């Protein structure tokens, strides 16, 4: 250290006057020439102080070869120098001894006279800071006032940031903010360029500390704390890059000050916020023990002067003594920060960075890190630390402070089993995760919990002594859960309580108002008598009680989820009492009105329906209270009820406010738009819902409430008629309940519908407003493009030498065109037409530039193919570039002043570069095409360009090798010779040719090479811009292009870094390693961060892991690896979560600069987009330095909320690959662009990963760029967005910049992605972030947040719930319609007209309701297309939009939409119930392979196929009982749920493949019973069971044990809800409908004679017994068969197995086959017992199926113990070898017997259902050429360009043909049998078998044992009385038809 021991900084304050450092404080002769100030003594040349032994040339940082001197005094001597010879940090260009840097580096300054003031010059810009502003009141705003230099401002000259760019003019002062280094062109000093690694931080730039001094600080801290050497070097470089980046656009003093403000002391610094939140100001003042933390006020006690003058600081501080308010604390803080020297500021930042750089997982806990830093800082300033002489051992900090915390976090999720870490079977609510640990440090009560091993508290020690005691802390005693992420649906109630309040209450208001017939005493239809007004008001008023109940339940849920012991938990008792009072207020008036009504003792109905004035008044008051309750609870966040975080008075909850509720406020237009959006959404919704849903529901309510059913009931319900008829009499009520529930769901769906529509409208309006739409300035997008390039892409204001704009534009435009040519997007003739050309000018000897006609001619026709192929990638890119420049874009700053940024790409095992084998060989066994063939079909034009290019290259090579020119004759031959080029892209197998083909294919697939090459365009863009904007640089190097290129590279390297985090790099296989090496050679500046592993030092310890960094300049070592530049040891394996976030976290320490762009390994970028980078970074609003010090005490700074994340657009480059790619692309397009546009405006956008830019300091000081708890943070990036939002960061969206992004293209991989998103959303609902946002955001922001994220998934669940509840309702309505006599109903007549025939049931009105429901569901699904069509319209025009829509429809995408909706809904539901959310690696390849039927079936059966099949049977019943044409749409929806996976399977309907696949399916069903088979039905069955049972933990080391990750057993409450209650409700509803169909409604004694059975006795039927027989008999029979098989297996198995290997499978086959046969038999039995009535039989089958499902769910949920991971018990059951299972052979047989009972029935179901699905495809496979049509639909390839069928050998072909014939015969035979079983009984049963069966089963007394097994048939069910008049028949009643009955949509 340079003399700073003991903290004496006088030398520092005197201008760094240490001996040996001759540089004065400021040495910039440009500002201080001889005429000004006393500093002229430094003469024309700045003093070349002698820096110790470090040489006298330059600053002595690097010697001539660019290396740091490794001398004996250097503490790094043993390491071989700062950047030792091998691992040189600067690039190799500095080491090539070509005389580039050999000349003496002389810091000569311009020898000219004084320079004109910058403020007078024309280039005075916002970046120029006026010096008189800087020295207001003789106080330096950038640190302390330097008394010595107070007079330096007289010249009135502003300060321009220095820069790396030298100015090469003599006497000049304008320029791109550059000091003058004064080399005239003729000086011959061109080679003496700055060797500075950090050019803006050099001694010429008035820097407060030189980089050597900063390095000394790092060395000193490292020796005092024991940080790692490599980590220190890494963090030193990190800090210097930050200072260099900031100092390139502001003064170095400002740069350092702003950096310190961002990290430590400013208003937005997380450390400062934490310091006050955790009351550490009090701890520092009086100690926690003496501070009463309970009732601190925020405000100062005495009214303070708002801002003391600087001089009064001491006085003000004295006044504030003893005042512990927040204001006083903040004043003291600012004073302390203001007095701090720049040296101390650097030291604090350095200490923070060193702690952060080694913090590993602790980086996920930002406040824990703040605490560690605070302890370290207190220790650093203590005398004990300053007195240290011996350096502390390396790794001390890591081992003592970080590792114990790391181990605690790891042990929460993992335990050691047999020496290996195994995941614990714990769910989130039992894991103390990163957030729980972090929240310990939010409150003083938490910090007080930190105890040492000796049980003393850490806070009892003085602050300076705490750091050394951290190693003794017993962390296990400190941490506890601060929020329980239990799997429960109540999270939705708590987090989104306002959604439920708004919808349920409004629904109640609407529906209760429209149900007068339910509350009228003795309602009569022909009178239409109304209830008293009091009751009408009061019934509506009960809505307030619903709102209050929701709030009460939400509060109780909060009680459960937020442990009371956490200091941040709100006090809920007061709130609960308040809510109970509100509930009583909302119920009491209604109780009076309904139970103690004034006229309740009236004589007749009319009297009782009259009102008293008091009742009426009470009713109105009740209604008014309800409305106010509703409004209050809708608007008020739950967290804001009665004293909470949201009250600003007390300091009690500052932490929760700071870290969970610091939302950036919306202002101005944004706020207006937010309110406007939600007012229009809910205005439209409430209007439409009232008219369409509720008003039209009025008539069904009326008719169902008066419907009377005469039925005989069921004999099983008792002996009296009343009990027997109990269910069937109430069928109308049951239907009404079901209809109301369905209506309620539609009420929710409506809102989302309007949100989508209006969001789209607002978004489009905004796109017109900013000009990003194709329609806005359409006429001049291209003609103005050159001008826009000049004004928006180039920073020309500061240019030294003024050129004509055309010269500059032409360079940029030509570069873009040539880059497209190089990527083979344009052919050479296109390029010629697009380039600017030099042509001879009219003036003699001069040349001029001719612009391409493209810019003009584009206006005549929208696109001409003469410039580029239509619909090509080139056209898309150029038109987006042109369009984007027509939008408002921030002005770019010169390259020199732009901030440094890093692109970060996490990589796990994604393809780096495709191998030749992958490209030209059919890899998939089921694929029909090579990848190259497929790519050639997709990009024909680009392939042609590539081939031409390759041929030119080959010809050139041939000529160079001296081959003769070709003659005429050869030309014909060469065409044949060229075939290989067109076929595979090369003729010679030399690596340079094959590599070209590999690269071409890789650049069109989803590979890391594509991503890296795309994002390396930033480097090209920076070089291009620097060259174009600084022509003097080009002139200076004259013709030496090599040196010029180096200079440009230096600039690019300084401003941009690309880090790929290759987690597995050190474990790569040979091929992967070669590919990575190829990347490094192609892009030497690419940096790769990876995990390096070393064996443990001692036996039994853990291996040591390191974060290492290499780049293309790193030296290759003997083992083939490269020598890392930095290698930082970690506490252990950093991958504790799902992987991606841990991967990002370990590499984050290697990011450089101010911003990070996070990129996935399947993205792409383009040169023209990279040119806009300066404007994109300007969106962070940090380009212009703030001229006020953040540390002036008493001055309130305007705290502007920092921009944390900037989202960008994505273009999905897989959109032209076929229907699925297009649908996926469309989804992303609308979500990522259309909705992001409005959501960012109204503050509802979060962070979705991909091309988003992050504010580095903001995010890294708040927990990093993603969260990482396993499972919980599955969608890791969105949590970073929520974290940024709740902590006060803004999230913006950038409209004019877009990256490419790949999306998965196969059906399976798209649905994997869907499942991942769905389960991830389930996890988000459990998370604390959702709780904070849901209970604290203001209403408009809350709605934006909800509908943009959770609402989408809730809506999907509601859609599927609505489909299911609608089908159940429809089944009940069908039953009602089937059994009752319809009325002659005319909706146009008055409702008081009598309905005929008398006693009829008006079910026609119900059919109107059914029609409206179908229309609603149609719109709900259709709406998903609207945003995409509108987006296409605005961005690409009418024709393209229409084309895309037609293509999607013809490709049957509506089927796919329905299916995806179900997958979303299912994955969210199953995650909330069972957990198991995990990262699913989604496929990156092309889906051209056919997937076997069995695989598809097993993948989607549980998620969708079973669900669809159940509903389809209900729909079949509805079709046969309540048909109307609109039901056709439902057939489409439900078929979509079943057949989508097969419909989107490539070549599914190819004749041969179909039958080969059928054979596979039969094998899949039967295998796995003799030895374990991963792809078998039994494995699928067991796997679907395990999510309920869980696995046994004991590992038996069997191969079949690896079938799945550990699945924890689901919670009992969740199992009850999803596995027991839901199936029970389903079984009950279907059973009720079945019983009603059999209840003999309207049967009278007159029917005796009409019965087809003589001797028939009228009476209740035995439908329940019939149902029980059909439901339970198959189970009983299966159990019997199994018992017999089990006996045989045990007795004969062990013996027979020796000779008959197939004994087990044969037994299994017999049992399974018998089960399937019995199931079919009992279907027929039901048919017979129902008298061959199809509808009744079907109702019975549906009910029996639901009952069986319920029984099996009960067995699996309650009776089964955990599953073995191996398949042993299943195999043992069939072959009898139980002895191999040890002790388990006692318990397992019984368990396995229960399993087998369920399995047999499930097998039968799968066998029958699988066959029916295959039979559905029969009509399709018979269509000729179906495969071609199907492929056109899937891949959008014309028949001429389609993929050829695979080629088989003769032997294979014969074998396939034989198999096809065999299995085709089997298929069609089974098809005929199945059809016969369904159709025959209905056709011939009644005719031939009727009487025989009747006599056999029913001898006139109800059959055997009087069971009434047979349903009577032939009865006419008609007890109506024609036109007999009934009731009052109020003649001439003037009641008109209600509005509702007139409602028809079409």
Swiss-Prot record:
Optimum pH is 7. Its EC number is 2.4.1.34. The gene is GLS1. Component of the 1,3-beta-glucan synthase (GS) complex composed of a catalytic subunit GLS1 and a regulatory subunit RHO1. The lineage of its organism: Eukaryota, Fungi, Dikarya, Ascomycota, Pezizomycotina. This is 1,3-beta-glucan synthase component. Residues 24-34, 43-60, 91-109, 1925-1940 have a biased composition (Low complexity). Its main location: membrane. It comes from Cordyceps militaris (strain CM01). Optimum temperature is 37 degrees Celsius. GO terms for cellular component: 1,3-beta-D-glucan synthase complex; plasma membrane. One of its GO terms (biological process) is fungal-type cell wall polysaccharide biosynthetic process. Pfam families: FKS1_dom1, FKS1_dom2, Glucan_synthase. Keywords: Cell membrane, Cell wall biogenesis/degradation, Glycoprotein, Glycosyltransferase, Membrane, Transferase, Transmembrane, Transmembrane helix. The chain crosses the membrane at residues 489-509, 537-557, 576-596, 618-638, 675-695, 734-754, 1356-1376, 1413-1433, 1500-1520, 1523-1543, 1615-1635, 1667-1687, 1703-1723, 1738-1758, 1803-1823, 1864-1884. Glycans are attached at residues 171, 290, 1017, 1312, 1649, 1918. GO terms for molecular function: 1,3-beta-D-glucan synthase activity. Activated by iron ions. Inhibited by manganese, copper and zinc ions.
């Amino acid at each position: 250290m340079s003399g700073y021991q003991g903290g004496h900084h006088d030398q520092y304050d005197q201008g760094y006057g240490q001996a040996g450092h001759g540089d004065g404080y400021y040495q910039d002769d440009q500002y201080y020439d001889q005429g000004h100030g006393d500093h002229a003594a430094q003469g024309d040349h700045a003093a070349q102080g002698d820096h110790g032994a470090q040489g006298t040339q330059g600053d002595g940082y690097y010697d001539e070869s660019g290396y740091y001197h490794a001398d004996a005094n250097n503490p790094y001597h043993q390491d071989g120098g700062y950047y030792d010879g091998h691992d040189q940090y600067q690039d190799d260009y500095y080491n090539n001894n070509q005389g580039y840097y050999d000349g003496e580096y002389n810091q000569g300054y311009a020898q000219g006279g004084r320079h004109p003031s910058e403020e007078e010059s024309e280039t005075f810009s916002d970046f120029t800071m006026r010096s008189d502003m800087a020295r207001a009141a003789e106080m330096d705003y950038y640190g302390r006032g330097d008394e010595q230099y107070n007079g330096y401002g007289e010249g009135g000259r502003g300060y321009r940031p220095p820069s790396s760019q030298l100015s090469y003019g003599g006497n000049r002062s304008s320029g791109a903010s550059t000091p003058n280094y004064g080399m005239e062109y003729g000086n011959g000093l061109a080679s003496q360029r700055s060797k500075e690694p950090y050019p803006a931080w050099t001694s010429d730039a008035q820097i407060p500390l030189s980089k050597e001094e900063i390095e000394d600080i790092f060395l000193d801290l490292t020796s005092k704390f024991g940080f790692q050497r490599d980590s220190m070097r890494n963090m030193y470089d990190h800090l210097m890059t930050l200072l260099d980046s900031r100092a390139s656009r502001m003064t170095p003093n400002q740069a350092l000050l702003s950096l310190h403000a961002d990290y430590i002391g400013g208003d937005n610094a997380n450390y400062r916020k934490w310091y006050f939140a955790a009351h550490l100001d009090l701890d520092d003042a009086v100690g926690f023990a003496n501070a009463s933390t309970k009732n601190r006020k925020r405000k100062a006690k005495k009214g303070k002067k708002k801002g003391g003058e600087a001089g009064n600081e001491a006085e003000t501080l004295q006044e504030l003594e003893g005042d512990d308010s927040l204001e006083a604390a903040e004043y003291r803080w600012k004073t302390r920060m203001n007095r701090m020297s720049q040296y101390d500021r650097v030291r604090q930042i350095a200490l923070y960075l060193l702690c952060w750089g080694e913090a590993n997982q602790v980086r996920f806990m930002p406040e824990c890190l703040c605490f560690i830093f605070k302890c370290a800082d207190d220790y650093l300033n203590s005398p004990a630390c300053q007195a240290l002489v011996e350096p502390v051992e390396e790794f001390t900090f890591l081992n003592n402070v970080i590792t114990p915390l790391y181990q605690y976090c790891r042990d929460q999720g993992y335990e050691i089993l047999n020496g290996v870490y195994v995941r614990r079977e714990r769910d989130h609510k039992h894991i103390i995760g990163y957030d729980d640990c972090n929240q310990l440090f939010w409150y003083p009560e938490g910090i007080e919990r930190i105890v040492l091993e000796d049980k003393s508290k850490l806070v009892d020690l003085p602050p300076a002594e705490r750091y050394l005691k951290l190693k003794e802390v017993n962390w296990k005693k400190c941490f506890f859960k601060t929020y329980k992420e239990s799997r429960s649906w109540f999270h939705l109630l708590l987090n989104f309580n306002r959604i439920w309040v708004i919808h349920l209450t409004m629904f109640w208001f609407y529906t209760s108002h429209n149900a007068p017939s339910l509350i009228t005493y003795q309602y009569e239809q022909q009178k239409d008598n109304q209830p008293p007004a009091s009751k009408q008001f009061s019934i509506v008023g009960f809505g307030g009680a619903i709102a209050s109940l929701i709030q009460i339940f939400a509060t109780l849920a909060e009680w459960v989820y937020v442990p009371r012991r956490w200091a941040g938990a709100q006090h809920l008792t007061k709130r609960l009492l308040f809510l109970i009072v509100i509930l009583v207020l909302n119920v009491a008036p209604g109780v009076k009105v309904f139970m103690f009504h004034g006229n309740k003792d009236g004589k007749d109905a009319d009297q009782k329906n009259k009102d008293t004035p008091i009742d009426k008044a009470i009713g109105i008051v009740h209604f008014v209270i309800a409305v106010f309750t509703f409004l209050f609870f809708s608007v008020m966040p739950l967290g804001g009820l009665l004293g909470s975080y949201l009250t600003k008075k007390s300091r009690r909850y500052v932490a929760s406010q700071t870290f969970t509720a610091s939302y950036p406020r919306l202002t101005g237009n944004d706020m207006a738009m937010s309110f406007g959006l939600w007012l229009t959404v809910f205005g439209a919704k409430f209007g439409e819902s009232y008219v369409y849903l509720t008003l039209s529901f009025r008539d069904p309510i009326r008719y169902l409430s008066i419907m009377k059913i005469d039925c005989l009931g069921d004999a099983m319900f008792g002996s009296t008629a009343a009990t027997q008829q109990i269910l069937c009499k109430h069928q109308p009520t049951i239907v009404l309940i079901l209809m109301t529930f369905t209506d309620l769901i539609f009420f929710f769906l409506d809102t989302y519908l309007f949100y989508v529509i209006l969001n789209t409208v607002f978004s489009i309006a905004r796109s017109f407003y900013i000009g990003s739409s194709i329609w806005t300035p359409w006429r001049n997008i291209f003609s103005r493009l050159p001008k826009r390039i000049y004004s928006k892409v180039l920073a020309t204001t500061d240019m030294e030498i003024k050129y004509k704009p055309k010269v500059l534009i032409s360079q940029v435009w030509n570069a873009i065109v040539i880059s497209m040519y190089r990527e083979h997007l344009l052919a050479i003739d296109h390029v010629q037409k697009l380039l600017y050309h030099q042509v001879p000018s009219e003036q003699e000897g001069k040349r001029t530039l001719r612009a391409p006609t493209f810019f003009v001619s584009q206006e005549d026709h929208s696109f001409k193919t003469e410039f580029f192929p239509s619909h090509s990638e080139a056209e898309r890119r150029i038109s987006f570039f042109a369009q984007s420049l027509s939008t408002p874009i921030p002005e770019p700053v010169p390259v020199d002043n732009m901030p440094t940024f890093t692109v970060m790409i996490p990589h796990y095992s994604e393809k780096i570069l495709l191998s030749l084998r992958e490209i030209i060989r059919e890899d998939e066994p089921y694929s029909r095409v090579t990848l190259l063939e497929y790519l050639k079909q997709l990009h024909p034009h680009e392939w042609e360009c590539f081939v031409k290019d390759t041929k030119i290259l080959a010809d050139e090579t041939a000529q160079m090798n001296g081959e003769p020119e070709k003659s005429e004759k050869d030309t014909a031959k060469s065409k044949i010779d060229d075939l290989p080029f067109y076929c595979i892209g090369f003729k010679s197998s030399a690596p340079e040719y094959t590599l070209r083909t590999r690269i071409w294919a890789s650049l069109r697939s989803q590979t890391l090479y594509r991503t890296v090459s795309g994002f390396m365009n930033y480097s090209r863009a920076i070089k291009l811009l620097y060259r174009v904007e600084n022509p003097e640089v080009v002139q200076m190097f004259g013709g030496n292009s090599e040196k010029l290129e180096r200079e440009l590279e230096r600039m690019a390297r300084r401003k941009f870094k690309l880090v790929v985090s290759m987690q597995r790099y050190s474990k790569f296989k040979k091929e992967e390693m070669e590919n990575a090496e190829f990347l490094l050679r192609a892009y030497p500046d690419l940096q790769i961060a990876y995990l390096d592993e070393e064996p443990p030092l001692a036996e039994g310890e853990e291996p040591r892991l390191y974060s290492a960094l290499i780049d293309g300049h790193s030296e290759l070592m003997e083992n083939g690896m490269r020598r890392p530049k930095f290698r930082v040891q970690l506490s252990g394996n950093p991958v504790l979560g799902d992987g991606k976030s841990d991967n990002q976290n370990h590499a984050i320490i290697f990011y450089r600069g101010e911003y990070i762009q996070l990129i996935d390994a399947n993205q792409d970028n383009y040169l023209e987009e990279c040119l806009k980078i300066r404007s994109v970074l300007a969106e962070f609003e940090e380009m212009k330095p703030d001229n006020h010090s953040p540390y002036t005490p008493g001055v309130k700074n305007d705290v502007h909320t920092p921009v944390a994340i900037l989202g960008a657009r994505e273009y999905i480059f897989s959109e032209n690959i076929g229907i699925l790619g297009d649908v996926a692309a469309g989804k992303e397009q609308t979500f990522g662009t259309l909705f992001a546009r409005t959501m960012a405006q109204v503050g509802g956008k979060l962070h979705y990963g991909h091309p988003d830019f992050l504010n580095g300091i903001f995010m890294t000081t708040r927990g990093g760029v993603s969260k990482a708890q396993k499972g919980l943070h599955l969608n890791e990036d969105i949590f970073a967005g929520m974290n940024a939002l709740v902590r006060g960061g803004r999230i913006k969206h950038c409209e004019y910049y877009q990256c490419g992004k790949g999306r998965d293209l196969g059906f399976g991989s798209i649905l994997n992605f869907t499942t991942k998103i769905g389960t991830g959303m389930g996890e988000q609902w459990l998370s604390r972030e959702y709780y904070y946002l849901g209970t604290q955001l203001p209403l408009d922001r809350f709605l934006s947040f909800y509908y943009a994220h959770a609402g989408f998934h809730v809506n999907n669940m509601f859609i599927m719930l609505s489909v299911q509840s609608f089908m159940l309702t429809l089944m009940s309505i069908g039953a009602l319609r089937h059994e009752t006599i319809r009325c002659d109903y005319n909706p146009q007549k008055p409702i008081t007209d009598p309905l005929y025939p008398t006693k009829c049931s008006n079910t026609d009105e119900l059919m109107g309701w059914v029609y409206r429901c179908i229309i609603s569901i149609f719109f709900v699904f259709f709406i998903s297309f609207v945003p995409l069509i509108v987006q296409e319209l605005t961005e690409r025009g009418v024709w393209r939009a229409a084309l895309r829509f037609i293509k999607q429809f013809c490709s049957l995408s509506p089927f796919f939409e329905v299916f995806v909706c179900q997958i979303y809904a299912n994955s969210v539901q199953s995650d909330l119930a069972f957990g198991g959310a995990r990262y699913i690696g989604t496929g990156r390849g092309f889906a051209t392979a056919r997937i076997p039927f069995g695989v598809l079936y097993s993948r989607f059966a549980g998620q969708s196929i079973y669900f669809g099949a159940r509903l389809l049977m209900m729909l079949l019943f509805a079709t046969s009982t309540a048909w109307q044409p609109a039901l056709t749409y439902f057939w489409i929806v439900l078929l979509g749920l079943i057949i989508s996976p097969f419909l989107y399977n490539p070549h599914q309907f190819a004749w041969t493949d179909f039958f080969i696949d059928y054979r596979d399916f039969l094998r899949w069903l039967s295998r796995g019973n003799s030895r374990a088979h991963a792809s078998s039905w039994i494995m699928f069955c067991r796997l679907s069971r395990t999510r309920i049972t869980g696995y046994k933990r004991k590992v038996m080391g069997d191969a079949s044990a690896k079938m799945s990750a550990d699945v924890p057993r689901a919670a009992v409450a969740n199992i009850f809800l999803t596995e027991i209650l839901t199936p029970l409700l389903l079984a009950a509803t279907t059973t009720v409908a079945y019983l009603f169909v059999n209840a003999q409604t309207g049967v009278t004694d007159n029917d005796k004679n009409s019965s087809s059975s003589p001797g028939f006795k009228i009476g209740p039927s035995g439908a329940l017994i019939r149902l029980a027989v059909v439901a339970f008999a198959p189970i009983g029979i299966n159990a019997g068969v199994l018992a017999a098989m089990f006996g045989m297996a045990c007795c004969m198995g062990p013996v027979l197995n020796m000779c008959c290997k197939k004994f087990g499978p044969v037994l299994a086959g017999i049992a399974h086959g018998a089960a399937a046969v019995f199931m079919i038999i009992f279907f027929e039995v039901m048919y017979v017992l129902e008298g061959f009535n199809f509808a009744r039989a079907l109702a019975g089958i549906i009910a029996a199926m639901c009952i069986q499902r319920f029984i099996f769910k009960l067995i699996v949920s309650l009776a089964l113990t955990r599953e073995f991971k191996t398949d042993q018990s299943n195999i043992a059951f069939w072959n009898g070898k139980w002895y191999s299972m040890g002790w388990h052979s006692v318990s397992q047989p019984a368990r396995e017997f229960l399993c087998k009972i369920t399995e047999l029935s499930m097998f039968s179901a799968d066998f029958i259902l699988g066959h029916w699905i295959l039979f559905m495809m029969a009509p399709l496979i018979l269509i000729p050429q179906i495969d071609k049509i199907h492929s056109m639909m899937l891949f959008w390839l014309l028949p001429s360009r389609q993929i050829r069928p695979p080629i088989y050998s003769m032997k294979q072909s014969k074998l396939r043909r034989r198999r096809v014939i065999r299995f085709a015969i089997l298929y069609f035979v089974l098809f005929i049998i199945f059809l016969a079983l369904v159709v025959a009984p209905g056709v011939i049963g009644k005719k031939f078998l009727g009487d025989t069966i009747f006599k056999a089963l029913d001898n006139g007394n109800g059959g055997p044992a009087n069971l009434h097994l047979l349903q009577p048939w032939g009865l006419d069910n008609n007890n109506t009385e024609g036109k007999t008049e009934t009731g009052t028949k109020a003649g001439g009643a003037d009641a008109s038809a209600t509005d509702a009955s007139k409602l028809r949509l079409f």
